[in-house]
């Protein structure tokens, strides 16, 4: 009986085992699924991720959108692609999956410094510029591509010199003597400029505008932070992309000069020059200066990868010939990045970026104010009777101007045509990410950033007047800088119930080294050998070397808390220790706090269906600025004074002497900016309309100032100290709308920024004068003092031309019956009331149109060029505007007489407001079915026009210029500045 029961039990166990084996075998037999992923225009989506739900089993779609994957029976597939909504479907053979475009910007991932969050969870003031925004325009400068795209970001192109960097301000100017440039962070590496970076390599840009977001970067973030993420390799099918374009550039030409007869008549009235009769027009100086410039840009990239290994490689060439002859720029760029998942818990990244860029024809050609405004004003100032070359000596430029000191624009160009600056930059970064557990990760990165530069100048001893006086001059300067950054960051993310916590702590070490050597030479025999070994005299005072270094050690932390996506709070703290400061002032602490309330998640909002998201934000924080500090500013530094050892009566054994160059100041510290921000985010109508509003108030204190003490009052006269404060406050608004979403799509993005700047206080010196105008007037036109906006113009109030005398009447401000220096007052403000940008994009069946309009309102320009071209104070030629000058008593005109009482005054202050059609781009995506036979996945020819139309009352060549470039204390000065270009661009984008 027992045996029978045992046998029955064994038979049962065997049967059960057999069933389990059969079931396991059946389960292990995966099924092969094929399908296609398309978009809403029935075009294949290349590289879309197709993942078996709940597993890591996945593939990517090929060039035709097809995929093949083996999955378990009954599995579901999850399909995702950037810019489209994720979609989940049941796995079935031959399935066709259509992805819809992602219209909800709230799910966009935003970089916030050492981390990222979704746009909907941002508690601070952050603006975004996407690769799509850059892709619609043929740009070569990454910085210029942001113009008009983000509220609170004021970008102006100070001059049109090839390769010139734009001026960027985030919420106004914060420093009088330090840098006002934002901090750039490229793939986690902080840096001061991005000239080396090709716009085609950029994937996304985030602008941290308020202190509560930027404080995580501490003492370098007072001017805002621009975080740039570059394109990385993606798993899927290999993709090769080519973007090539060619541009034709012209200049806005609105300056006309007097002809020979008109010029002689003017000179007779002034009485300084006696010209002979019968002078004839010989030269149109515009033709000798301007040309049709061109830009050619070619960018090639390759990306490929698997779920374990991904890479991205790009390279390109940019070449520009400026609209002023002999000026040019060229850049070669290369970048490679690789990402490897070595283990499930270990990911390694490595990237190398190299750029080689060269500027030629820099110096006077850019209008540095020397030689009466340089090339541009010389076009008007040079008489038309003069030839280019001296008929009696054809190797020399003509300079017989009957005793008048005039240098023709052609000679001005020759003086700088051999000026060249060449730089190469290498940025190498290695990163490792260790995942201890899903909630806990550790990131370490080490980067090396090296820039090497060579600046050479040569002025031949024959063709130019100054060259003959100096017997030719040469210069060779070499500098090299290297920056090492080592970051270590620990992140912890945990969600439990309605609560989520994101904690981060880390450290950063930065070391910078710089060195320079330079040689000046002169006395060349001819122009055949421009190198210094052909110079017979090497300057004993203009030759030398220098070096410096600095370092920062930092620790930082951030804590983010989110309850039910309704209440959010963020706290940051960073401590920076800088070698630029004395030991007892070396460390600074920069805290910030921010919070947000998603009102739309409250119960009382549930019945309001047209509101998709409503969030109120607020934040406070502190940031620093140490850019105005030299590497050893707190120490007393000494100058080396060389003693001439050669020549009769000199000691051949003479040694140099030393003198103190500045006073030490161990109390120096960095500038500190405290900022408060309140904002509102609103998304309505099914995510089709998004509105952002922000109000901010930021105050900078302990501004870095320089003072020159009276002679003999101390061991040295120069002192750097902290003293003074400045305020910026304003409003920002941004609106994005999807106006049409059918076959015809129309999207609009608009932003506008209002900023008010005021220099609140100064210590020691209460007034700083800057920006001397013409040698004849010899007065400074900028006066910075408490209570006024930075860079305000200072001078006399012009009240029109006296009909009886022809002189300009100036206002007696003091009322003492006399017009004297005490009657000078504030006459203009270069800061705009507001700046704006408006982008409209249209697309229909592959045809795409993008229109960008941007502008500025309320800013004044001091037009020093007019002082040279309408001043009538010496023997230079003038513009045709002086034909309306006063000549006889009783004449009513707004142009004074020849040789009038010219002064810095409101007569030369003009409204610099403008509205500009910055870019119009039209492109066409050739249908896939027409190009697939050639192995292509994308073919997009395009045409674009840049700076096509400018509406302005400004009489100069362009209202966007600033002679003093990136200066914070001097703005809105036009003195022969290199004009901006109008461009027509033809290009093509190809992918295969």
Model-derived features: positions:
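Repeated loop/turn-to-beta-strand initiation elements of outer-membrane beta-barrel proteins
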Residues: 308-311, 345-348, 439-442, 498-501, ...
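Short, small/polar-rich motifs associated with maturation and membrane association
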Residues: 1-335, 340-355, 364, 368-369, ...
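Residues on the lipid-exposed face of transmembrane beta-strands in outer-membrane beta-barrel proteins
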Residues: 230, 259, 300-304, 334-340, ...
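Surface-exposed loop/interface segments of Gram-negative outer-membrane beta-barrel transport/assembly proteins
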Residues: 234-283, 323-327, 333, 337-425, ...
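A generic beta-sheet turn/junction motif
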Residues: 41-43, 52-54, 71-72, 221, ...
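Transmembrane beta-strand segments that form the barrel wall of outer-membrane beta-barrel proteins
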Residues: 244, 315-321, 569-578, 620
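Active-site phosphate-binding and catalytic loops of NTP-dependent enzymes
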Residues: 154-157, 215, 600-607, 929-932
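Conserved C-terminal beta-signal and adjacent last beta-strands/turns
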Residues: 13, 747, 829-857, 903-951, ...
């Amino acid at each position: 009986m027992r045996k029978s029961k045992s046998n029955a039990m064994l038979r049962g166990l065997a049967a059960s085992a057999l069933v389990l084996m059969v079931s396991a075998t059946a389960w292990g037999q995966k099924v092969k699924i094929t399908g296609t992923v398309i978009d809403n225009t029935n075009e294949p989506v290349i590289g879309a991720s197709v993942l078996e739900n709940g597993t890591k089993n996945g593939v990517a779609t090929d060039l035709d959108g097809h995929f093949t994957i083996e999955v378990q029976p009954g599995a579901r597939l999850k399909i995702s692609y950037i810019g489209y909504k994720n979609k989940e479907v049941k796995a079935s053979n031959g399935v066709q999956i259509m992805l819809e475009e992602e219209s909800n910007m709230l799910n966009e991932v935003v970089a916030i410094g050492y981390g990222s969050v979704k746009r909907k969870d941002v508690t601070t003031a952050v603006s975004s510029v996407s690769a799509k925004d850059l892709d619609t325009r043929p740009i070569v400068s990454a910085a210029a591509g942001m113009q008009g795209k983000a509220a609170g970001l004021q970008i102006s192109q100070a001059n049109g010199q090839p390769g010139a960097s734009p001026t960027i301000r985030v919420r106004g100017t914060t420093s009088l003597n330090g840098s006002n440039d934002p901090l750039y962070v490229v793939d986690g590496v902080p840096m001061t400029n991005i000239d080396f970076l090709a716009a085609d390599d950029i994937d996304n840009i985030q602008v941290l505008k308020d202190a509560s977001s930027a404080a995580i970067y501490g003492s370098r973030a007072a001017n805002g932070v621009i975080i740039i993420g570059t394109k990385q390799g993606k798993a899927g099918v290999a993709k090769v992309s080519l973007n090539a374009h060619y541009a034709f550039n012209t200049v806005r030409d609105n300056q006309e000069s007097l002809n020979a007869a008109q010029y002689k008549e003017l000179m007779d009235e002034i009485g300084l020059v006696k010209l002979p009769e019968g002078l004839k027009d010989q030269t149109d100086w515009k033709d000798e200066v301007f040309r049709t410039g061109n830009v050619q840009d070619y960018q090639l990239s390759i990306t490929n990868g698997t779920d374990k290994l991904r890479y991205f490689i790009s390279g390109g060439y940019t070449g520009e010939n400026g609209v002023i002859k002999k000026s040019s720029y060229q850049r070669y760029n290369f970048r490679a990045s690789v990402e490897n998942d070595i283990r499930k818990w270990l990911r390694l990244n490595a990237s190398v970026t190299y750029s080689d860029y060269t500027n030629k024809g820099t110096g006077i050609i850019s209008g540095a104010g020397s030689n009466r405004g340089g090339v541009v004003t010389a076009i008007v100032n040079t008489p038309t009777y003069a030839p280019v070359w001296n008929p009696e000596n054809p190797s020399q430029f003509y300079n017989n101007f009957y005793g008048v000191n005039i240098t023709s624009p052609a000679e001005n160009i020759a003086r700088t045509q051999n000026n060249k600056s060449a730089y190469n930059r290498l940025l190498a970064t290695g990163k490792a990410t260790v995942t201890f557990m899903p909630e806990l990760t550790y990131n370490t990165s080490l980067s090396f950033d090296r820039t090497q530069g060579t600046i050479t100048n040569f002025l031949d001893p024959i063709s130019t007047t100054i060259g003959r006086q100096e017997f030719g001059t040469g210069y060779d300067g070499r500098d090299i800088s290297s920056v090492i950054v080592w970051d270590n960051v620990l992140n912890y993310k945990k969600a439990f119930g309605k609560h989520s916590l994101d904690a981060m702590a880390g450290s950063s070490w930065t070391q910078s080294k710089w060195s320079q050597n330079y040689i000046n030479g002169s006395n060349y025999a001819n122009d055949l050998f421009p190198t210094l070994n052909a110079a017979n005299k090497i300057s004993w005072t203009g030759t030398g070397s220098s070096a410096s270094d600095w370092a920062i050690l930092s620790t930082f932390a951030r804590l983010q808390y989110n309850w039910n996506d309704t209440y959010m709070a963020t706290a940051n703290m960073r401590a920076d220790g800088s070698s630029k400061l004395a030991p007892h002032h070396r460390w600074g602490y920069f805290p910030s706090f921010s919070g947000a309330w998603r009102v739309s998640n409250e119960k009382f909002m549930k019945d309001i269906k047209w509101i998709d998201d409503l969030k109120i934000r607020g934040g406070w924080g502190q940031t620093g600025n140490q850019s105005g500090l030299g590497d050893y500013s707190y120490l007393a530094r000494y100058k080396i004074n060389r003693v001439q050892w050669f020549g009769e009566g000199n000691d051949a054994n003479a040694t140099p002497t030393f003198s103190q160059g500045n006073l030490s100041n161990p109390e120096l510290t960095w500038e500190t900016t405290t900022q408060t921000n309140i904002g509102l985010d609103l998304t309505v109508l099914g995510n089709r309309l998004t509105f952002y509003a922000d109000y901010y108030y930021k105050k900078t204190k302990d501004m870095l100032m320089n003072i020159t003490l009276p002679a003999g009052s101390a061991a040295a006269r120069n002192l750097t100290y902290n003293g003074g404060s400045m305020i910026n406050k304003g409003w920002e608004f941004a609106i994005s709308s999807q106006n049409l979403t059918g076959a015809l799509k129309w999207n609009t993005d608009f932003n506008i920024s209002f900023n008010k700047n005021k220099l609140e206080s100064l210590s020691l010196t209460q007034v700083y004068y800057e920006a001397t105008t013409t040698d004849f007037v010899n007065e400074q036109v900028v006066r910075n003092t408490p209570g006024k906006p930075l860079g305000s113009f200072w001078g006399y109030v012009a009240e029109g031309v006296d009909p009886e005398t022809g002189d300009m009447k100036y206002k007696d401000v003091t009322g003492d019956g006399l017009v004297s220096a005490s009657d000078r007052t504030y006459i203009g403000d270069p800061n705009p009331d507001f700046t704006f940008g408006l982008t409209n994009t249209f697309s229909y069946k592959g045809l795409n149109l993008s229109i960008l309009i941007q502008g500025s309102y309320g800013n004044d320009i001091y037009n020093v060029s007019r002082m040279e071209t309408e001043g009538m104070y010496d023997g230079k030629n003038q513009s045709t505007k002086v034909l309306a000058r006063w000549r006889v008593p009783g004449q009513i005109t707004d142009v004074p007489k020849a040789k009038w009482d010219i002064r810095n005054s409101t007569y030369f202050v003009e409204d610099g407001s403008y509205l500009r059609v910055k870019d119009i781009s039209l492109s066409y995506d050739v249908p896939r079915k027409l190009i697939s036979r050639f192995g292509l996945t994308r073919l997009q020819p395009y045409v674009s026009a840049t700076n096509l139309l400018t509406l302005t009352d400004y009489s100069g060549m362009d209202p966007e210029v600033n002679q003093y470039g990136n200066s914070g204390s001097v703005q809105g000065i036009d003195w022969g500045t290199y004009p901006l270009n109008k461009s027509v661009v033809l290009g093509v984008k190809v992918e295969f």
